[in-house]
Amino acid sequence: MQLLAVGLNHTTAPVSLREKVAFPADQLGQAVASARSWYGRSDATTYTDEAAILSTCNRTELYAASNLPGGVNEAIDITAHFLADYHKLPYAELRPYLYALPQDNAVRHAFRVASGLDSMVLGEPQILGQMKDAVRQAEAAGGLGTYLHQMFQRTFAVAKEVRSTTEIGAHSVSMAAASVRLSQRIFDKISEQNVLFIGAGEMIELSATHFAAQNPKSVTIANRTLERGQTLAHRFNGKAIRLADLPDQLASYDIVISSTASSLPIIGLGMVERAIKARRHKPMFMVDLAVPRDIEAEIGRLDDVFLYTVDDLGSFVQTGVENRQAAVAQAEAIIETRVRSFMHWIDARAVVPVIQDLHESSETMRMIELERARKLLAKGEDIDAVLEALSKGLTAKFLHGPQQALNNAQGDERARLAALLPQLFRTKR
């Protein structure tokens, strides 16, 4: 059994591709089942017993515990075909952007991701919650077995250790904070701007918190469910509107921050063109934090619109990285120690079937000799003589296999067994 992590992220693929292979949160369980089924197809030489999928705005990754007779390259191909088939994309479009990490590299990657070392925002905490959600869904879908369950439990423990014993998350600039900084390049005073947030999830809540600190002129939450939008808007003394109201009200807002789970764009080119015309070409600042994107990319070409995606925010969120290099080194050292510990556990698991076979074989021998002793006792034989025969019979049966193997071996094989048997039976020789 081998562990494998296959996927793409913000360092290997642009948002235009990442959004095509993103899995909606409510489809992760179904996707895990599909992945396991795909790996087990008769035309595939790889079979996965366990699988989990992590899908965020910055990455889509499949973790698997599989038999891999074809090696890593075959695993990449099979996973790429699965992703392409599931999302109805050309295989050739995905293959160059994928990475595949086997065994200890897969474990190390999972530990680094959960600890925030592989994030666009170094040390950001949201990824840990996202990974926990992915694992819960994989478990509910039957995707977790002995290996992935143990790996993810250790992953969460490592992430907790890294975050509690290092400064990896200190002074990091989040996407939400970067959005505020960028908007201040367009508008001198946020306090004079009307801000619209589309969605009501964690990212929007974080963004609204950062913008609220700048005392904007107004705050509005647009959400598919009005009640949920109202709950969030109340926290920021704002109002809530329905997504259906956006075409008529978009022109009222100077700053638009969007992050929903929609699989299709919510704001189209025509809607923004009409809004800009109604605003008499007053600039509009827009940040699309969603993957797949909520705002059509073509909108960024409009003269009076400043549109940024998660990839565009990358340079802003690197602030303070240099100051955290010592924390990174500490975190990497912790991770390396924990990877070695986990791989030792993996190696130990490999001999479990051998140990089980030994127990079963010994139990069979024991039952044979015990039954023979019971029959002798039933005939009235002397108990000491029966016990003596029982002990000798067990000894003979236990040693028969090793003795026969040693007698039948020749040359180097006999020398190897002769050196090994004293270690196994802890004799003096």
Swiss-Prot record:
One of its GO terms (molecular function) is NADP binding. GO terms for biological process: protoporphyrinogen IX biosynthetic process from glutamate. InterPro entries: 4pyrrol_synth_GluRdtase, 4pyrrol_synth_GluRdtase_dimer, 4pyrrol_synth_GluRdtase_N, GluRdtase_CS, GluRdtase_dimer_dom_sf, GluRdtase_N_sf, NAD(P)-bd_dom_sf, Shikm_DH/Glu-tRNA_Rdtase. The record marks H109 as: Important for activity. Pathway: Porphyrin-containing compound metabolism; protoporphyrin-IX biosynthesis; 5-aminolevulinate from L-glutamyl-tRNA(Glu): step 1/2. Gene3D superfamilies: Glutamyl-tRNA reductase, N-terminal domain (3.30.460.30), NAD(P)-binding Rossmann-like Domain (3.40.50.720). Keywords: NADP, Oxidoreductase, Porphyrin biosynthesis. The active site is at C57. Its EC number is 1.2.1.70. SUPFAM superfamilies: Glutamyl tRNA-reductase catalytic, N-terminal domain (SSF69742), Glutamyl tRNA-reductase dimerization domain (SSF69075), NAD(P)-binding Rossmann-fold domains (SSF51735). It holds the Pfam family Shikimate_DH. PROSITE patterns: GLUTR. Substrate binds at T56, C57, N58, R59, S119, E124, P125, Q126, Q130. It catalyses: (S)-4-amino-5-oxopentanoate + tRNA(Glu) + NADP(+) = L-glutamyl-tRNA(Glu) + NADPH + H(+). It comes from the Bacteria. It is an enzyme of class 1 (oxidoreductase). NADP(+) binds at G199, A200, G201, E202, M203, I204. Homodimer. Belongs to the glutamyl-tRNA reductase family. Possesses an unusual extended V-shaped dimeric structure with each monomer consisting of three distinct domains arranged along a curved 'spinal' alpha-helix. The N-terminal catalytic domain specifically recognizes the glutamate moiety of the substrate. The second domain is the NADPH-binding domain, and the third C-terminal domain is responsible for dimerization. NCBIfam families: hemA. This is Glutamyl-tRNA reductase. It comes from Janthinobacterium sp. (strain Marseille).
